[in-house]
Amino acid sequence: MDLLNTLVDKGLRRETPTREEALAVLVTSDDDLLDVVAAAGKVRRHWFGRRVKLNYLVNLKSGLCPEDCSYCSQRLGSKAEILKYTWLKPDQASAAAAAGVSGGAKRVCLVASGRGPTDRDVDRVSDTIKAIKEQNESVEVCACLGLLSDGQAERLREAGADAYNHNLNTSESTYGDITTTHTYADRVDTVNKAHAAGLSACSGLIAGMGESDEDLVDVVFSLRELDPDSVPVNFLIPMEGTPLAKEWHLTPQRCLRILAMTRFVCPDVEVRIAGGREVHLRTMQPLALHLANSIFLGDYLTSEGQAGHADLELIADAGFEVEGAGEVTLPEHRASVRGGGCGSHEGGGACGSHDGADGDAGCGSHAGGGVCAPAPAATTPRPAEEPRTDLVAVRRRGAGTDLAPNA
């Protein structure tokens, strides 16, 4: 397929695909799916070999968030029966992090519900970061505390944080449909604050909220322009008690296409399969490792994940290897200049240098030779054949409980 050859060539050179090419990946047929995975896999292996980075989530403060994000079980007014607790103490968080590290995690992600941290909260998290680093100096620590105020990113970095996560989640044009208590611009501002403070920026998306193909392409191109080092791709976990509990639009094949498109648009970035991996990819998880080079180990913030040992078996059985603590995740050109990778290299097709980063465009069919025809009108996503509610389980172990964590 000429389209895939073009995308591989561009990915190996870090050139930006067109929006038409990106959308074309999302509308490939099931007959072409393995070809799509193989093509994106060439790009993944070129930049990241066969390594898989393991990340481990520690939910520092769960539930009772004042924001109204419709996808979130911790949102204002959520009726989801999740764990609710206030801030973990540094020694509790450090113990939870140690479980993930012993299970093979290279990065620990410290997450707290809420609009954003107060200065006292930053002090609290700083103490937690120091406790984790004292226990294991080599572990990477990523903070995810919501919207940042001036100076807070710098304080987190001084405390030892390596990265900061704040996802864009969806396209700017549809952001108001999922959240009304803050704006898309607020999120962009926080990612930029992390960049400016010298933290490795991490920002991604959520697929499966009823968005169109154009929305997915739009948010991934916006992420490319923001230039994070890590792009987590979440697949919506429709939790009972949230407004999106009935949104079951994803199939394993759809998830693979989304991951492949993300890899083609962000070829040299850590693409992480995040929440919803087990629920939506299911038995196709091994194929997804040919597209992404990073996953979360064990459980998520409020829902259970696959058993930690099963994650390790998945990686080994698929012919991949866990990235070691001494290995550098990012390609040399990105790792050498933190925050200056994807958009800072030479060449007119550089990541972040494309035209019309926020416009919508698409490609519905090919007119021979890989030429994209005009995009069709946006369509409502088709629901999966049967919602797999049996695969959604609320987390009842690990942080905030007396039970051992899943790592």
Curated annotation (Swiss-Prot):
It catalyses: (4R,5S)-dethiobiotin + (sulfur carrier)-SH + 2 reduced [2Fe-2S]-[ferredoxin] + 2 S-adenosyl-L-methionine = (sulfur carrier)-H + biotin + 2 5'-deoxyadenosine + 2 L-methionine + 2 oxidized [2Fe-2S]-[ferredoxin]. One of its GO terms (biological process) is biotin biosynthetic process. Residues 47-277 form the Radical SAM core domain. [2Fe-2S] cluster binds at residues 109, 142, 202, 272. Its cofactor is [4Fe-4S] cluster; [2Fe-2S] cluster. Coiled coil: none annotated. Binds 1 [4Fe-4S] cluster. The cluster is coordinated with 3 cysteines and an exchangeable S-adenosyl-L-methionine. Binds 1 [2Fe-2S] cluster. The cluster is coordinated with 3 cysteines and 1 arginine. Residues 373-382 have a biased composition (Low complexity). It holds the Pfam family BATS. Catalyzes the conversion of dethiobiotin (DTB) to biotin by the insertion of a sulfur atom into dethiobiotin via a radical-based mechanism. Homodimer. This is Biotin synthase. It comes from Streptomyces coelicolor (strain ATCC BAA-471 / A3(2) / M145). The gene is bioB.
